[in-house]
Curated annotation (Swiss-Prot):
It is an enzyme of class 4 (lyase). The gene is moaA. Its cofactor is [4Fe-4S] cluster. Keywords: 4Fe-4S, GTP-binding, Iron, Iron-sulfur, Lyase, Metal-binding, Molybdenum cofactor biosynthesis, Nucleotide-binding, S-adenosyl-L-methionine. This is GTP 3',8-cyclase.
Length: 332
């Protein structure tokens, strides 16, 4: 039998799924959500079994990489068991997870044993007070302990994700690179994404491009362009002074990666988002609940949904919000 694959209307193969397991988070990062964020009632959220069933259908259709996200995925009860189920799906090559690191101290080893291959950990500052300001509730020491616990558990190629904001943490770029070098971690610098209406700061004023980040790094290190890929949006560079780590740049504004987009997102409400920067979506939860025990109905809906995937997003570097859902509702 020939391999089943998902192809969108622009002949791009879609084999990477980002699945949100919760919209809830123990942080309130200023670029991600409002401080008084109202979370979804439980009846609107997919059950763990439904998340697993959706993962089964996507893998049956050729998905090779799944990343679990949130909110903060590790605060959802039962998430380690879910990881073990998904990691065991025949045909899935890689199960990854993005976390703020707050729960890794106790969950890194169970996640590794469950079959999670790689972790991305958000870290925007190495200054405890600034970290608290940017996350509103976060404890820097707890996150660093979690990163060290992940290394001790056996995780390799753990990656730090840093959202760079002008006047907030841009002066810490090289300190974060040095932190990554010392702990043998990859690191990606991310341009702030205009999702959700915020009042805490002006996105136009806080924008700091990937080019500016590279220029800042080049003041201390020698950058070497790399053709490496992790099947995601990061474009990688190496450092002559520390060739064992990778530096990634995720640049939705300045160098968008739409032309080679291979991914879709599933919200914890069961909506399949065809693009991070558009509202095109399909309600897979409705299909799943209307046709229990009929995976073929779900797979048909997924295949049809690929026709709705746009060629590119519509992000702009200003304060005009094209997408009103916050990042935690999208699946970060």
């Amino acid at each position: 039998m020939s391999e089943r694959v998902l192809i969108d209307g622009y002949n791009r193969r879609v084999d990477y799924l980002r699945m949100s397991v919760t919209d809830r988070c123990d942080f309130r990062c200023v670029y991600c959500m409002a401080e008084d964020m109202q979370f979804l009632p439980r009846q609107r959220v997919l059950t763990l079994e439904e998340i697993y069933q959706l993962a089964q259908s996507f893998v049956a259709l050729g998905t090779r990489k799944i990343r679990l996200t949130g909110g903060e995925p590790l605060i959802r009860p039962g998430v380690v068991g879910l990881c073990k189920q998904i990691a065991a799906l025949p045909g899935l090559r890689e199960l990854c997870l993005t976390t703020n690191g707050s729960q890794l101290g106790k969950l890194a080893s169970p996640l590794f044993d469950a079959g999670v291959k790689r972790l991305n950990v958000s870290l925007d500052s190495l200054d405890a007070e600034r970290f608290k300001q940017m996350t509103r509730t976060g404890d820097l020491a707890q996150v660093i302990d979690g990163i060290d616990a992940a290394r001790a558990a056996g995780f390799t190629r753990t990656k730090l994700n840093c959202v760079v904001m002008q006047g907030r943490n841009d002066h810490e770029i090289n300190d974060l690179v040095q932190f990554a070098i010392e702990r043998d971690l990859d690191i990606s610098f991310i341009e702030e994404m205009p999702l959700g209406i915020i009042s805490e700061h002006s996105r136009a004023e806080s924008f700091f491009s990937s080019t500016q980040v590279r220029e800042r790094i080049a003041e201390r290190y020698t950058l070497i362009d790399s053709a490496e890929s992790t099947h995601g949006p990061s474009r990688y560079w190496r450092l002559a002074e520390a060739p064992h780590i990778r530096l990634g740049f995720i640049s939705p504004h300045s160098h968008n990666f739409c032309g080679t987009c291979n991914r879709v997102r599933l919200t914890v409400e069961g909506r399949l988002l065809l693009c991070l920067g558009n509202e095109h979506s399909v309600d897979l939860k409705a299909v799943l609940r209307a046709h229990p025990g009929q995976p073929e109905r779900l797979e048909k809906a997924i295949i049809e949904a690929m026709k709705l995937k746009p060629y590119r997003h519509n992000f702009e570097v200003n304060d005009d919000v094209q997408v009103v859902r916050f990042m935690n509702m999208t699946g970060g």
